[in-house]
């Protein structure tokens, strides 16, 4: 065809359009010599169908040790992969013999109309600066019905569970990493088992639907095995009330935001969660790179344990369908990150949201999934994990293995391979799914917001006014529990009213535990003084003299003679010839009274009759005498 003929044919076209526009020609008219190309109409994708997925890429996003690392491994037909066991010790060569098939069904999600990364980052930055989620108008939200995973089909649910169980590494010596950003000279010893967030990317045959499976928490409980150290930091940061503080001393502390008992700085916690070396920021970066490779694909999220929680947070952020298994309750970090919430929903309670498109499968014997792995004797606590969150967003699909199978609550039931073989494959029917609305996290805690510049040190000044008591006493007659003499006590209390209280008492009848006399109290204020005069009682001196020649267990067994000299008082003289076994005298007593002058001293006293008794018969080991003879001496 000549150039003139080509130009003529172009001129006869109805219109000229760009190459990427959809063009639909009208039926050719009878007078047109050319038949226009028939371009098929591209309508909306089908909401139902069957998808066969294959592993396409493996992503690694560095976090703690290498925060700037982001690399991708493309899976090719000749790529040799090893499957890593749950404990990270056993490896076996992978053969993809069984296809991963899942079906789709219509799913309604309420999400943002503009979900570009730059827009989402603006909302998150505003939430970090203000301390709360951005309030958006209803016009910025849409209700989209799209093709989502069919959570009522058992085979589809099993497929997603197997995706979360697969943990692959390339056979050593055959690595072929593509570095998205970061340095290109990482040593071969820096494998992805040492640091970072790992994601496995599956795509169907038409690349219209992709699944991002995020790697979950390493099962090792103590530091040094795989990514367990980094996983523990993120677990305690996202799912603890205050970064592992305020609980068991075994919990690993990952921030310093606690101010006092059950009181914490929420701004401090949120800043730590949004650091670039945390899993949530790494998950956003990983998701943005995957969507750059598949811009028109429908994205589904899945994950197990910590990976399931991160998948759910991404789903809430970008409005994606999510299927998780034994996921850590993630409503607490969703509220703290300030994720946008539709009108009519409290952003502080994301578990009350509807139409999230998230489904969390788990069973009642898993303490991590049920939010109970935080007791003093739990394995999580002994391993240093502070798993205090208890609420999930979206729908919970719970297998009651405790009631149905009699299982005990144990951390060993948390492993995804055990969940697949002992739960998902055993139960004939899938459990019903329902939201968990009546659930609250960290109810004992109080959180406050700040501008981020406050010091974490607090000081408290307490002023106390105490009374001062002055006591002066001289004891002449001490008793068992105090002095039996008269006492004078003066108490002065100093207060802001400068009131002085003085109490004076004189005891005439002392008792064992205090004075039995009535108490008289005189309060003195700035007024004319009052003088009170108390007469001094008369003291009678008493003298007693004794000499013991025959001491006993509890006293003297000698005949005793006591002479008391008191003016105008009687005197008594006694001599005991027959003392008792413990106390007392069996002799007859004689009393002499001298009404005018004291009686004569002992040498001039008149001798009294003396009786002597001899016991001839006794009972009760000699304590009682029943027969005696007596001789009277004069």
Curated annotation (Swiss-Prot):
It catalyses: a triacylglycerol + H2O = a diacylglycerol + a fatty acid + H(+). The keyword Membrane applies. One of its GO terms (biological process) is neutral lipid catabolic process. Glycans are attached at residues 150, 185, 207, 265, 289, 451. The active site is at residue 305. The chain crosses the membrane at residues 5-25. It is a single-pass type II membrane protein. It comes from the Eukaryota. Residues 26-634 are lumenal. Keywords: Autophagy, Endosome, Glycoprotein, Hydrolase, Lipid degradation, Lipid metabolism, Membrane, Signal-anchor, Transmembrane, Transmembrane helix. Its EC number is 3.1.1.3. It holds the Pfam family Lipase_3. One of its GO terms (molecular function) is triacylglycerol lipase activity. Lipase which is essential for lysis of subvacuolar cytoplasm to vacuole targeted bodies and intravacuolar autophagic bodies. Involved in the lysis of intravacuolar multivesicular body (MVB) vesicles. The intravacuolar membrane disintegration by atg15 is critical to life span extension. Binds to both phosphatidylinositol (PI) and phosphatidylinositol 3,5-bisphosphate (PIP2). Belongs to the AB hydrolase superfamily. Lipase family. This is Putative lipase atg15. The lineage of its organism: Eukaryota, Fungi, Dikarya, Ascomycota, Pezizomycotina.
């Amino acid at each position: 065809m000549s150039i003139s003929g080509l130009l003529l044919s172009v001129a006869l076209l109805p219109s000229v359009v760009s190459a990427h526009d959809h063009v639909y020609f009208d039926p050719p008219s009878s007078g047109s010599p050319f038949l226009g190309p028939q371009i098929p109409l591209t309508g909306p994708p089908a909401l139902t169908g069957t998808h066969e997925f294959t592993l396409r890429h493996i992503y690694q996003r560095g976090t703690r040790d290498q925060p700037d690392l982001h690399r991708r491994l493309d899976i090719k037909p000749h790529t040799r992969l090893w499957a890593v066991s749950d404990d990270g010790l056993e490896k076996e060569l992978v053969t993809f013999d069984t296809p991963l098939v899942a079906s789709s069904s219509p799913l309604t999600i309420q999400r943002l109309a503009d979900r570009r990364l730059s827009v989402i980052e603006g909302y998150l930055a505003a939430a970090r600066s203000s301390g709360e989620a951005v309030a958006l108008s209803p016009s910025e939200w849409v209700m989209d019905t799209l093709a989502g995973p069919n959570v009522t089909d058992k085979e589809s649910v099993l497929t997603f569970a197997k995706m979360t169980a697969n943990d692959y590494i390339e056979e050593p010596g055959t690595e072929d990493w593509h570095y998205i950003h970061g340095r290109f000279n990482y040593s071969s010893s820096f494998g992805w088992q040492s640091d970072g967030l790992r994601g496995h990317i599956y795509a169907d045959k038409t690349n219209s639907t992709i699944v991002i499976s995020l790697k979950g928490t390493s099962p090792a409980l103590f530091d040094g095995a795989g990514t367990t150290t980094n996983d523990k930091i993120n677990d305690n940061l996202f799912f603890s009330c205050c970064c592992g503080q305020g609980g068991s001393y075994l919990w690993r502390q990952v921030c310093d935001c606690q101010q006092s008992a059950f009181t914490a700085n929420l701004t401090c916690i949120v800043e730590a969660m949004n650091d670039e070396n945390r899993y949530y920021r790494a998950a956003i970066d990983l998701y943005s790179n995957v969507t750059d490779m598949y811009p028109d694909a429908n994205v589904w999220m899945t994950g197990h344990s910590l990976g399931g929680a991160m998948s759910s947070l991404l789903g809430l952020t970008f409005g994606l369908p999510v299927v998780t298994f034994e996921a850590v309750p993630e409503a607490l970090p969703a509220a703290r990150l300030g994720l946008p919430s539709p009108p009519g929903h409290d952003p502080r309670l994301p578990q009350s949201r509807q139409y999230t498109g998230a489904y969390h499968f788990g069973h009642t014997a898993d303490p991590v999934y049920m939010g109970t792995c935080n007791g003093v004797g739990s394995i999580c606590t002994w391993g240093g994990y502070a798993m205090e969150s208890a609420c999930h967003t979206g729908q919970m699909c719970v297998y009651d293995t405790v009631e149905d199978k009699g299982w005990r609550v144990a951390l060993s039931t948390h492993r995804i391979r055990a969940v697949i073989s002992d739960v998902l494959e055993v139960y004939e029917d899938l459990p019903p799914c329902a939201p968990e609305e009546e659930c609250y996290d960290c109810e004992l805690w109080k959180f406050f917001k700040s501008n981020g510049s406050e010091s974490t040190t607090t000081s408290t000044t307490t002023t106390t006014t105490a009374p001062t008591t002055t006591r002066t006493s001289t004891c002449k007659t001490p008793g068992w529990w105090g002095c039996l003499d008269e006492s004078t006590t003066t108490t002065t209390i100093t207060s802001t009213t400068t009131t002085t209280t003085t109490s004076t008492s004189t005891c005439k009848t002392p008792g064992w535990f205090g004075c039995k006399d009535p108490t008289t109290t005189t309060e003195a204020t700035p007024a004319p003084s009052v003088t009170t005069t108390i007469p001094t009682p008369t003291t009678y001196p008493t003298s007693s003299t004794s000499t013991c020649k025959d001491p006993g267990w509890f006293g003297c067994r000698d005949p005793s003679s006591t002479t008391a000299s008191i003016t105008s008082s009687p005197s008594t003289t006694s001599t005991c010839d027959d003392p008792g076994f413990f106390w007392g005298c069996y002799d007859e007593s004689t009393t002499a009274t001298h009404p005018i002058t004291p009686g004569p001293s002992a040498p001039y006293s008149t001798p009294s009759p003396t009786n002597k008794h001899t016991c001839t018969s006794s009972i009760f080991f000699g304590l009682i005498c029943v027969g005696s003879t007596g001789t009277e001496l004069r």
